[in-house]
């Protein structure tokens, strides 16, 4: 097997959705970005929401002096999809997007109380919150929750490729129907690697079949390959009292 883990391939997963969205929107470029401030920050868009209730996001006690998760922690199995346990669903029942309207009442991720703990549980919660926040972002164009997750500098720069797409989505100009971001951990526990940890995983960035716009037009989303599980691993490094996470995948062009 000649496949190797590729940082650029991982960034390709992040940018694939934006590229597909903008390609699908090419015929729609005459549509103006809403009557409001759609060109402003997505956090001030109609899809933006106030932060989650404070009682749900009280910071846990952390031990930044510790360089690794406590050895006394039970060897719990975290194998499987990294799922966030709590969402704010007070807006009502979630409705996927259709040709007539964007997704409605999108559940808002609630930051786990143990997310900043220097433990395997803390790393798991960070990964789960990252997946949920990224899905919320590509659904609503609002990255307020995604900004609560620390990622490496290269990945943060790669996120800038989503800016134009986010403006379209947040302004109600165009939208995906029901995007899904899924990170599945394929081992029970992470493995120590240098100053951090690696966790074998698969990643799915499924942006769905269609992009719709406010003028009633529908354009198919080109396949990116990212809608199928991509093998790789999550990197986690505890720094500054939080977990910094990074996605690593095999090159999309490689056979695995």
Predicted regions and their residues:
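Juxtamembrane and targeting peptides
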Residues: 26-122
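Secretory targeting signals
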Residues: 1-5, 15-20
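Exposed beta-sheet edge and beta->alpha loop/turn motif
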Residues: 17, 32-49, 53-58, 62, ...
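Core segments of small alpha/beta cavity-forming domains
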Residues: 96-174
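N-terminal export leaders
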Residues: 7-11
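A short, amphipathic edge element
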Residues: 170-189
């Amino acid at each position: 097997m000649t496949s190797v883990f590729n940082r650029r391939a991982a960034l390709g997963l992040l940018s694939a959705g934006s590229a597909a969205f903008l390609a699908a929107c090419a015929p729609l470029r005459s549509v103006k970005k809403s009557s409001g401030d759609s060109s402003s920050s997505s956090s001030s868009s109609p899809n933006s929401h106030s932060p989650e209730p404070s009682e749900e996001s009280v910071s846990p006690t952390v031990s930044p002096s510790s360089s690794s998760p406590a050895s006394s922690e039970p060897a719990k199995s975290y194998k499987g999809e990294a799922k966030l346990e709590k969402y704010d669903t007070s807006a009502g029942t979630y409705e996927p997007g259709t040709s007539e309207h964007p997704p409605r009442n999108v559940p808002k991720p609630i930051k786990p109380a143990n997310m900043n703990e220097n433990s395997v549980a803390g790393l798991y919660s960070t990964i789960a919150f990252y997946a949920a926040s990224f899905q919320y972002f590509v659904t609503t164009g609002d990255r307020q929750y995604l900004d609560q997750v620390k990622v490496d500098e290269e990945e943060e720069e790669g996120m800038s490729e989503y800016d134009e797409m986010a403006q379209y989505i947040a302004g109600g100009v165009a939208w995906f129907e029901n995007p899904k971001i899924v990170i599945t951990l394929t081992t029970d526990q992470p493995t120590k690697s240098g100053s951090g940890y690696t966790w074998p995983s698969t990643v799915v960035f499924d942006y769905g079949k269609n992009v719709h716009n406010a003028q009633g037009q529908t354009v198919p989303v080109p396949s990116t390959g990212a809608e199928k599980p991509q093998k790789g691993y999550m990197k986690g490094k505890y720094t500054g009292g939080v977990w910094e996470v990074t996605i690593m995948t095999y090159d999309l062009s490689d056979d695995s």
